[in-house]
A protein has these predicted regions:
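Active-site rim helix/loop that mediates acceptor-substrate recognition in acyltransferases
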Residues: 15-36
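Short glycine-aromatic motifs
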Residues: 36, 104-107
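Conserved donor-binding loop and adjoining core beta-sheet/short helix segment
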Residues: 32-69
Length: 118
């Protein structure tokens, strides 16, 4: 079993909250192409992607699931990798509960994303 398949339940659970923007296959293809990165842990995983803005590059946590402490541990490795790729910031999109959980880890809320069907 590959790491991606082992992490599939966490990825699919996170996708259920992602606004129906991607399927598991989309994520698998993104990882295979190098446009997304898989950060596996024994009891969780995260998926990141680099976002290039005119003034900076961000390593964006696109999906995360599993045990919170393991997710916190893996962000250190992801941040180091992101710095090596020229990123100056790490961002995350997720449910509102992440704000409370991440504040103690030095994260701050800089914007809110809202959605309306059209």
């Amino acid at each position: 079993m590959t790491e991606l398949e082992r992490c599939r339940p966490w990825i699919e659970a996170a996708l259920a909250y992602s606004g129906d923007t991607h399927t598991f296959q989309d994520v698998a293809d993104g990882i295979a192409s190098g446009h997304m990165q898989l950060w596996p842990a024994p009891k969780g995983c995260a998926v990141t992607q680099i976002v290039v803005y005119p003034k900076k590059k961000a390593l964006h946590i696109f999906l995360a699931g599993g045990e919170m402490d393991q997710l916190f541990d893996m962000t250190e490795s992801a941040m180091a990798w992101g710095r090596g790729q020229g990123c100056s910031v790490m961002t995350l999109s997720g449910r509102m509960g992440w704000q409370r959980a991440l504040r103690s880890e030095g994260w701050k809320t800089t914007m809110v994303v809202m959605e309306k069907d059209i």
